[in-house]
Amino acid sequence: MPTISQLVTTSRQDKNYKSKSPALHYGFNSLKKEDSEYNSPQKRGVCTRVTTMTPKKPNSALRKYARVRLSNGTEVTAYIPGVGHSLQEHSVVLVRGGRVKDLPGVRYHIVRGALDATGVANRMQGRSKYGAKRPKAAKKK
């Protein structure tokens, strides 16, 4: 524990926390041709590659992911949630933060139901997370 005189000479330093989704924390100013720091909840991007990946040890599957070039120029790997998708190269998508625990290097999710990423078809529960509209038959009077 520091003494009073030690605290007088050098005050306590705040801890610097490293971001878990760094690509969402800055933008590109095309007029000045430089990065500017600001946080955004999502960013738009263009898919450069859409393919599958196998997860880490205890799990087994073919997880769908896309390589996305964001509007700030960064290229990130983003997971495509839900069953089935219509994404291909040059699709415009919305990317949010959030890692996939069993896929190394995947720190972002693609938002379903926004831009070119269509919502999951025939989804009845948890629809808001997958961009699925409320079915006509289930509407109340």
From Swiss-Prot:
Keywords noted in UniProt: Methylation, Ribonucleoprotein, Ribosomal protein, RNA-binding, rRNA-binding, tRNA-binding
Domain of life the protein comes from: Bacteria
Keyword Heme in annotation: no
InterPro entries: NA-bd_OB-fold, Ribosomal_uS12, Ribosomal_uS12_bac
Region (Disordered): 1-22
Similarity-based family: Belongs to the universal ribosomal protein uS12 family.
Name used for this protein in its record: Small ribosomal subunit protein uS12
